[in-house]
Design a protein with these regions (language model features):
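Hydrophobic alpha-helical bundle signature of multipass membrane enzymes
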Residues: 1-139
Length: 139
């Protein structure tokens, strides 16, 4: 939820802070928040279904000598959840605030890549998550 370190929490906080800074009308805030929350929920459903369909092991599972720099989730690697959820959220936010599309894309990219840099995902996980998240966000 809002205020947590998870992708849904971060997306909601980023969206709220942005809309407050831009003095967006209450009507638009409610609309954007509703669509953003639905996109996050749909992306989570899609990514978890795919993770357990493909059941790709995480890098540290394949190479026990690999030391990760962040906590490692206990679910399959592919596709990357952070990439999927962040891209879905960024796609929604780009739709409503196209003037800052580059910023939303950069935030989603960084969220997804952080999991590769942390040693818990492969690049293919991120790439698939970006594709999936983009499609969910457009739906």
């Amino acid at each position: 939820g809002p205020g947590t370190k998870t992708p849904p929490g971060q997306l909601l906080v980023l969206g709220d802070e942005y809309m407050q800074k831009k003095a967006v009308s209450l009507q638009k805030v409610l609309l954007v928040r509703s669509v953003l929350t639905m996109a996050i929920a749909d992306a989570l459903t899609a990514v978890l279904d795919s993770k357990y369909t493909y059941f790709v092991r995480r890098p540290f599972m394949m190479d026990p000598s690999l030391i990760t720099i962040m906590p490692t989730p206990n679910h399959p690697s592919y596709p990357a959840g952070h990439s999927t959820l962040s891209t879905a959220g960024a796609t929604v936010l780009k739709y409503y605030f196209p003037e800052d599309k580059d910023m939303w894309e950069a935030k989603a990219y960084e969220a997804g890549m952080s999991r590769i840099w942390g040693g818990i995902h492969y690049m293919m996980d991120h790439e698939a998550g970006v594709i999936m998240g983009g499609k969910v966000g457009q739906a």
